[in-house]
Every structure is written in structure tokens, then in C-alpha cells.
Amino acid sequence: MAGFQHLSVMPEEVLRFLSPRPGGCYLDGTLGGGGHAALVAERCAPGGGTLIGMDRDLEALKAAAERLSRFGDAVRLLHGNFADIATRLDSLGVDALDGFVLDLGVSSHQLDTARRGFSFQQEGALDMRMDGDSGETAADLVNRLPEHELERIIREYGEERWAKRIASFIVRARSEAPIENTLRLVDIIKGAIPKAKWEERLHPATRTFQALRIAVNHELESLERGLKSAIDRLKPGGRGVVISFHSLEDRIVKHVFREYAAGCTCPRNLPVCVCGRQPRVRVLTGRPVTATEEELRDNPRSRSAKLRAVEKL
């Protein structure tokens, strides 16, 4: 699948924090086109190491299989949501990991393939499903949900201050005809946001499309569940690296890392600890790492990327 092109974000930083070693077992839970996975496999495959790649997008999985074929049996690929990491690793008989990486961004290929429905710049079916063949589509949501629920999704997942007007305009438009393609929804959103309030460097539909994509794919719930499962599987000294692309994702990553890094939670007035809680990870990134100026020039989509990393104690 030569058409599946995706520039991996912060490749050098991922390798620096993950520190993959020969013979180790590593997981890429959001495989995409296999860019990060290839970098990790190059370092862990010697000495009998394994790279496990997982993605819910079959097109991405097929592209990655081609890209990673040179590593032979050192690479094992799984189709599924990284929220189910625990059960999928069990099915492989993998009890522990030396490291994992999660790149939470939508790939360039997904954005640029009109029929997937992720892009607000191309006409296509209003789909937005990562796996492409199960669950409700974005069209299902915008045509079925009551106005107050649409408003909540757009406000919470898109952090869109015009959520109330956008939801109202959607409900009004769907009463005339079902909303089934991307550009019709874009026109509705543009009509809802006063043109004088459009942001200079942000398309008016950006936040609403993000919100619908998150809702369709249950992204935030999947992130928290999958991230905790991956940390639980790390060996002592094993590392986890996560790249997020918006504040909702980054907030969850930061919260989970802090939760696992926390020690005693007893009230301060107790003379001795009775909870027995010990830190389970060490946070390696006090502040999130961002792309260099050079990378921003080469890959503008890295602009919003934030990398956080932990090490299992």
C-alpha cells in the first residue's frame, strides 16, 4: 500500500525515551504506517527481540505489514483497539513488556482519504470510524442524537465555544434532509459560527470534526484503559512513551502518569502510612516534549504533538 504515507512524529525523541534494546519485547499500540515500529524493531530484533504492532485500522495494518516485512518473525501484528491490549497480549502469551509507544494522532493517510470522512477539506461520506466496519458513524450521531447531547459532545470533546449554536444548526439542517457527507456538515458549521469570529489559523470545522471523531471511536475511554493496561505490563525498568495531539488526550496521559507515580495517600496527620501505596512509575518528562523547529518545518502536523514518558519501578 504505497499510498499510505505518514511521517512519524518525534522519532528521535521516541527512541531516546523508549531506549529499545536488542532482545527486548516492545509494543506499538497505535501502529499506523509502522514508522515508529520500524525504528524500534531495528533495535530490538537483533538478539531475538519482538515488536508487537496493533491497530484498529485494517488499511494501516496492511501498510505496516509491508513496511515491516523485512523483520520477519520479529514482528507480530494484531488487528484491534489498544484498549484491549491486556487480552490481546494474553492471547499471544506475552506477560511483560520492555516498553510501549502510543502515537495518538490521526494519520495523514486517514485525513487525506476522502471516503474515510475525517477531513473537512474533502467531500466524503460522514464516517470517521477508525476500524471502518463496526459501530456508529459520525453521520449516525449527527442525525440521531438529541440537540443537548450533540452540544455536550462538541463542547467537551471539541472544546468548541460555539457548541450550542452548532448543535442547533445541525438539528435544523437534518430536519430538512439527513446530513450524510463531510462538506454539507462543514457548511452547517460555517453558518453557525459568525464569520467575524472565525480564527485565523484554524478552520471553523476543526473542533467539531475532532469532537465527532472522538465520540465515534470512543477515543478517550480507549486511551485511559489501554494506557493503564500497558503500564501494568511493563517490566521494572521498562518504559512507556505517549504522543498526544490535543489537550483532552494530554490531560488523560498526565493524570494516569501522576496516578501511577503517586506514593502514600494517607492524611498528613497520620504518624505512619497505613495505605501501603508505593509509586509504580517514575515520570521521565516533567513537562511534555514538543517537536523541534526543524521537524515543524518538515512536518507541520507535529505542531500540536506532546510527548510524555514513564519508567516502571
From Swiss-Prot:
EC number: 2.1.1.199
Sites where the protein binds S-adenosyl-L-methionine: 34-36, 55, 82, 103, 110
Known role: Specifically methylates the N4 position of cytidine in position 1402 (C1402) of 16S rRNA.
Signal peptide: none
Source organism, top-level taxon: Bacteria
Subcellular location: Cytoplasm
Chain segments annotated as transmembrane: none
UniProt similarity note: Belongs to the methyltransferase superfamily. RsmH family.
Source lineage: Bacteria, Pseudomonadati, Thermodesulfobacteriota, Desulfuromonadia, Desulfuromonadales
Enzyme class: transferase
GO terms of molecular function: rRNA (cytosine-N4-)-methyltransferase activity
Keywords tagged on the record: Cytoplasm, Methyltransferase, rRNA processing, S-adenosyl-L-methionine, Transferase
Keyword Methyltransferase among UniProt keywords: yes
Organism expressing this protein natively: Pelobacter propionicus (strain DSM 2379 / NBRC 103807 / OttBd1)
Statement: the UniProt record of this protein carries the keyword Membrane: no
GO cellular component, one term: cytoplasm
Alphabetical list of InterPro entries matching this protein: RsmH, SAM-dep_MeTrfase_MraW_recog, SAM-dependent_MTases_sf
Reaction(s) this enzyme catalyzes, per UniProt: cytidine(1402) in 16S rRNA + S-adenosyl-L-methionine = N(4)-methylcytidine(1402) in 16S rRNA + S-adenosyl-L-homocysteine + H(+)
GO BP field: rRNA base methylation
Name of the protein this chain belongs to: Ribosomal RNA small subunit methyltransferase H
